[in-house]
Design a protein with these regions (language model features):
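Amphipathic alpha-helical assembly/interaction segments
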Residues: 1-104
Length: 104
């Protein structure tokens, strides 16, 4: 797992959350929670001895990453995030999902 991809995505999420217009706190919270859940599930998966337990948490992390992508899609459609920011986020998520898929 590349920590650079994960940390870059978390930094981007922080930027997006800080820049969303007033009235979109729910969208911000949902994206932040899903992104942080990716990190927590990867950490929890790494802490288990059995492959089955680890895999379960990596699958959850992958699902949370997909939720982040869906959140970015909605924000882009609603014109709440710049195209460049959206594309950067999707690119990071594609890398993250690919890495998690290999771990499953």
């Amino acid at each position: 797992m590349s920590i650079n991809v994960l940390s870059s995505f978390l930094a981007l999420v922080g930027d997006i959350a800080g820049e969303l217009p007033k009235g979109h706190a729910e969208r911000s919270d949902q994206l932040v929670r899903a992104a942080e859940s990716v990190v927590r599930n990867i950490a929890e998966g790494a802490g288990w001895w059995s492959e089955a337990d680890s895999t379960k948490h990596y699958k959850i992390a992958r699902g949370e990453a997909m939720e982040c992508a869906a959140s970015l899609d909605v924000m882009k459609l609603r014109r709440l995030v710049a195209t460049e920011t959206y594309e950067n986020g999707i690119q990071l998520l594609e890398s993250l999902v690919a890495m998690l898929t290999k771990m499953i």
